[in-house]
Design a protein with these regions (language model features):
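Structural detector for short beta-strands of small beta-barrel domains
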Residues: 2-27, 82-103, 134-135
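Short, solvent-exposed interaction modules
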Residues: 70-127, 131
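Short, Lys/Arg- and Gly-enriched loop/turn segments at beta-strand edges
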Residues: 67-77, 138-150
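Short nucleic-acid-contacting surface segments enriched for D/E, G, S/T with interspersed K/R
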Residues: 49-63, 120-136
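Acidic (E/D-rich), amphipathic helical modules within compact regulatory domains
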Residues: 23, 28-79, 84-85
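Structural preference for solvent-exposed beta-strand-turn elements
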Residues: 2-19, 109-111, 117-128, 137-138, ...
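Short, surface-exposed beta-strand/loop "edge" segments at domain boundaries and coil↔beta transitions
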Residues: 41-45, 112-116, 143-144
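A structural detector for beta-sheet-dominated domains
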Residues: 36-38, 65, 96, 108, ...
């Protein structure tokens, strides 16, 4: 059963979800978290940046960051992340923010994903909010927990 999304307004670049699992670092793998998102069946596994203090099964707010290998404008399709379970490899969504200094765009793909443009031929200034784009994601997408303000929980 899908749980309804919270309705409290927060920074649109922040992802709001539920912590499903926490995995410690190993010799060949950094620490990771698995998150679920309201109104979706996504279970996204991301590299944890910093200390993730939420309890498993509880709500969590933070920033999902990924490196976009190339960003293409698309005219059809919707918002999605592939695969539904695991580490993201492909993201399609509408642009909700662009940071020309950091060369990032934030996509609404069921949850916000901040994508750093890594193709040297592409700059964030070339993209506009509202455009529908699709990109391949380099391995190693991350999640950084943000402590919510009292009205963001």
């Amino acid at each position: 059963m899908l749980k309804p999304a919270p309705t409290t307004r927060i920074d649109p670049t922040l992802a709001r979800g539920t912590l499903l699992a926490r995995s410690p670092a190993t010799n060949d793998r950094p620490p990771s978290v698995t998150l679920a998102f309201p109104n979706t069946h996504y279970e996204m596994t991301l590299t944890a940046v910093g200390d993730v203090k939420a309890d498993v099964g509880k709500r969590i707010i933070g920033i999902i960051r990924a490196e976009a290998q190339r960003v293409d404008l698309v005219k059809t399709g919707g918002r999605f992340v592939e695969p539904v379970y695991g580490m993201p490899r492909r993201v399609q969504g509408s642009i909700i923010a662009a940071d020309n200094t950091a060369n990032t765009i934030t996509l609404h793909a069921g949850m916000p994903v901040v994508c750093k443009l890594t193709d040297p031929r592409q700059r964030a200034v070339a993209f506009e909010p509202g455009q529908l784009v699709c990109c391949e994601i380099a391995p190693g997408a991350t999640f950084t927990q943000k402590a919510p303000a009292r009205d963001e929980a």
